[in-house]
């Protein structure tokens, strides 16, 4: 047998009245808390008992809520803002938009899986179906992006392989060309030849300034640049040029000696 309906009137018994007040007060504060959490509403409850004791609840801050309430009361007293004025149609449209926004926000929260206590089984099944459709769409989009990235990576890999093959061919061509140069030409660029001892006769016969100048101009080693085939010809021509120069120097030395003897 169900519980009978309680008649709403003042309880005459003081003890029963106090017990009922405590129970109903706790239930009221609990409902206010649930309302603030489920609906994301700013709720404030103020209760004074028969003896004057204060009981209050606020989802944010009691002072903040009271200040907001006072500002709302002031703005509603200004002409043209109250919905019960000439702009009743506009206010009705605004209320409809607010309700629609509130409903969309509630659906958004349901999609996140937050306030599900008040949903029925049918609503939960419908929500599950929507989430499955959304999940399928997300997976398809993800697979498409991954396939695109994979294709781009393959193209980059093919380009890199072609560039590496081209560079490898160029290196092989250079390697096949450089050894021939090193074998035939590189060793013969610089060669040294010793001077024939016959060309150094002036080292013992020069006198005074002539001896010093000739010693500064002669050396034991000369540097010759040229190809291998030109080495013998160069040495031969050098010997031919040095022979007459040696004779001319000897003649000039003899003349200088004769002049000094005549002066004495």
From Swiss-Prot:
<protein>
    <recommendedName>
        <fullName>Agamous-like MADS-box protein AGL15</fullName>
    </recommendedName>
</protein>
<dbReference type="InterPro" id="IPR033896">
    <property type="entry name" value="MEF2-like_N"/>
</dbReference>
<dbReference type="GO" id="GO:0003700">
    <property type="term" value="F:DNA-binding transcription factor activity"/>
</dbReference>
<dbReference type="InterPro" id="IPR002487">
    <property type="entry name" value="TF_Kbox"/>
</dbReference>
<feature type="domain" description="MADS-box">
    <location>
        <begin position="3"/>
        <end position="57"/>
    </location>
</feature>
<feature type="domain" description="K-box">
    <location>
        <begin position="87"/>
        <end position="177"/>
    </location>
</feature>
<dbReference type="GO" id="GO:0046983">
    <property type="term" value="F:protein dimerization activity"/>
</dbReference>
<keyword id="KW-0539">Nucleus</keyword>
<keyword id="KW-0238">DNA-binding</keyword>
<keyword id="KW-0805">Transcription regulation</keyword>
<dbReference type="Pfam" id="PF01486">
    <property type="entry name" value="K-box"/>
</dbReference>
<feature type="compositionally biased region" description="Basic and acidic residues">
    <location>
        <begin position="230"/>
        <end position="244"/>
    </location>
</feature>
<dbReference type="InterPro" id="IPR036879">
    <property type="entry name" value="TF_MADSbox_sf"/>
</dbReference>
<dbReference type="Pfam" id="PF00319">
    <property type="entry name" value="SRF-TF"/>
</dbReference>
<dbReference type="InterPro" id="IPR002100">
    <property type="entry name" value="TF_MADSbox"/>
</dbReference>
<keyword id="KW-0804">Transcription</keyword>
<feature type="region of interest" description="Disordered">
    <location>
        <begin position="223"/>
        <end position="264"/>
    </location>
</feature>
<dbReference type="InterPro" id="IPR050142">
    <property type="entry name" value="MADS-box/MEF2_TF"/>
</dbReference>
<dbReference type="GO" id="GO:0000977">
    <property type="term" value="F:RNA polymerase II transcription regulatory region sequence-specific DNA binding"/>
</dbReference>
<dbReference type="GO" id="GO:0045944">
    <property type="term" value="P:positive regulation of transcription by RNA polymerase II"/>
</dbReference>
<dbReference type="GO" id="GO:0005634">
    <property type="term" value="C:nucleus"/>
</dbReference>
<feature type="compositionally biased region" description="Low complexity">
    <location>
        <begin position="245"/>
        <end position="257"/>
    </location>
</feature>
<comment type="function">
    <text>Probable transcription factor.</text>
</comment>
């Amino acid at each position: 047998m169900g519980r009978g309906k309680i008649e709403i009137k003042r309880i005459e018994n003081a003890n029963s009245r106090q017990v009922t007040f405590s129970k109903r007060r706790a239930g009221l504060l609990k409902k206010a808390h649930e309302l603030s959490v489920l609906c994301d509403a700013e709720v404030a409850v103020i209760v004074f008992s028969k003896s004057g004791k204060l009981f209050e609840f606020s989802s944010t801050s009691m002072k903040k809520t009271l200040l907001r309430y006072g500002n709302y009361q002031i703005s509603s007293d200004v002409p043209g803002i109250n919905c019960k004025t000439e702009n009743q149609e506009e206010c009705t449209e605004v209320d409809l938009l607010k309700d629609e926004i509130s409903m969309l926000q509630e659906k958004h929260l349901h999609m996140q899986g937050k306030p599900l206590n008040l949903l029925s089984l049918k609503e939960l099944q419908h929500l599950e179906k929507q989430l499955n459709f959304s999940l399928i769409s997300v997976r398809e989009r993800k697979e498409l992006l991954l396939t695109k990235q994979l294709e781009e990576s393959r193209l980059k890999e093919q380009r890199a392989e072609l560039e590496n093959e081209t560079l490898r061919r160029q290196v092989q061509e250079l390697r096949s060309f450089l050894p021939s140069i090193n074998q035939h030409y590189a060793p013969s660029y610089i060669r040294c030849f010793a001077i024939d001892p016959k060309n150094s006769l002036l080292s013992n016969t020069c006198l005074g300034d002539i001896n010093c100048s000739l010693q500064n101009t002669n050396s034991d080693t000369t540097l010759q640049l040229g190809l291998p085939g030109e080495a013998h010809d160069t040495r031969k021509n050098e010997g031919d040029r040095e022979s007459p120069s040696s004779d001319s120097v000897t003649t000039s030395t003899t003349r200088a000696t004769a002049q000094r003897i005549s002066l004495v």
